[in-house]
Amino acid sequence: TDGYSILQPRVGVSLPSSQRSWFVKLFGGDPGVDPYTRVVSDLYQDMFGEGSFVGKGIYDVETFEHLCGDFPENAILSHDLIESCFCRSGLLSDVVLYEDFPSSHAADAGRRHRWMRGDWQIAAWLLPRVQGFGAKRLSNPISALSRWKIFDNLRRSLLPTCMLALLAGAWLAAGSFAAAAATVFVLGVVAIPRLLSTLADFVSKPTDMP
């Protein structure tokens, strides 16, 4: 299939919400209007020519309704990913759409929990046949890349539970060395990506800066 039914802008933090709490300041990223120096790369768009829809974008309404009009009713809470699997989404990294960032950890956790519930509701689209509108069963039309995106979201949703289970098992059923090793491993999984990202920000600067 050629072309896109959805064009997905990059999502940024709105200025009013950026000063709402320390939680937003720490985890919300950089606010402001600067689409040119903050253009980012996206693995899926760069390698496969297809991005992921996050719920707000530019639609070809007729094509969207034609391709996404056969979902089962009242069965999908988070519809963004499955819609981009059917309709193909192109990322516009130099166009920014601003939205509020959750002001507290509880609000952010609630949002992520809602997203994860939605991801598990579309897990059936990993199978060869899926439920369509009503009770009819259809051949699953989405691509292998789309199925990988669904699987990857499910994998990421299980990481916190798996790490907690690893810590509990190591501390309750293993020796002190295994417990310490498991703790160091989990801390490394959580901290190293953030530390590397922070270090990269310190040692590099945009090419347009003196």
What is each model feature region?
Residues 133-162:
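Loop-to-transmembrane boundary segments
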Residues 155-210:
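Membrane-embedded multi-pass helical conduit in multi-pass membrane proteins
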